[in-house]
């Protein structure tokens, strides 16, 4: 699989959607929920706001954010793959009081009006875009001035020969792929290592964000620098 290929990435997430949440819990020992809440906390969400979840997947972040913007607000989740969106809509239907909507869409061309959102998150999505720089530009375009955004993803270690990178390789090859193999998804999760290798590191992410028009950008390592949170102000 070619990292960043839009059609292949969409097919990948359609394929893994039924097992995605279960594998996330197992592979992170549930810690992904904490990291995602840290991303949401950066937004300082308030009732009445319109928030955007780009590459929303099965909708777990969007549903948490929807609790924060009640009453009077709205959370819009966009994803290119239809199978995760079906799961997101089913989850939302069980919590029908939440102001959340899910649509199929392209993170590089959302179709939203300029300055539409009061805040946005993108979790494990920027790394999978064909053009991460263009993704950050579109993210900036749809945010009102002064709005906050958070981009959560795997962190590419700065030293490929260092201990952090060595642990990441061990984790991906000896834990992630074997567990995915049990679910019949070995090929899909083997893609992770290649996608991380081509993903911009922390310094480049900050630079790309500033070039995209963000006023502030900082990258915060999480989970012993295995994950990273790019915190942005439009």
Language-model-detected regions and their locations in the chain:
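A short acidic, Gly/Pro-enriched loop at the edge of an enzyme's catalytic core
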Residues: 108-120
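Conserved alpha-helix/loop element of class I SAM-dependent methyltransferases that forms part
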Residues: 29-49, 64
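A short SAM/SAH-binding and catalytic strip from SAM-dependent methyltransferases
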Residues: 118-132
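C-terminal alpha-helical "lid/dimerization" subdomain adjacent to the S-adenosyl-L-methionine
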Residues: 7, 155-208
């Amino acid at each position: 699989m070619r990292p960043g290929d839009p059609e292949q990435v969409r097919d990948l997430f359609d394929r893994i959607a039924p097992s995605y949440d279960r594998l996330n819990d197992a592979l992170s020992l549930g810690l992904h929920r904490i990291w995602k809440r840290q991303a949401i906390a950066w937004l300082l969400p308030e009732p009445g706001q319109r928030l955007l979840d780009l590459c929303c997947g099965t909708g777990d972040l969007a549903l948490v954010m929807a609790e924060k913007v009640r009453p009077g607000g709205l959370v819009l989740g966009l994803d290119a793959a239809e199978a995760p969106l079906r799961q997101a809509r089913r989850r939302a239907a069980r919590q029908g009081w939440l102001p959340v909507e899910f649509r199929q869409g392209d993170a590089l061309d959302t179709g939203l009006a300029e300055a539409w959102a009061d805040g946005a998150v993108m979790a494990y999505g920027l790394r999978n875009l064909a053009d991460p720089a263009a993704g950050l530009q579109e993210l900036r375009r749809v945010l009102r001035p002064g709005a906050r955004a958070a981009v959560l993803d795997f962190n590419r270690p700065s030293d490929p020969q260092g201990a952090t990178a060595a642990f990441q390789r061990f984790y991906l090859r000896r834990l992630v792929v074997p567990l995915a193999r049990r679910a019949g998804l070995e090929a899909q999760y083997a893609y992770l290592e290649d996608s991380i290798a081509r993903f911009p590191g922390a310094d480049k992410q900050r630079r790309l964000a500033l070039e995209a028009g963000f006023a502030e950008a900082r990258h915060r390592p999480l989970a012993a620098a295995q994950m990273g949170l790019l915190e942005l102000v439009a």
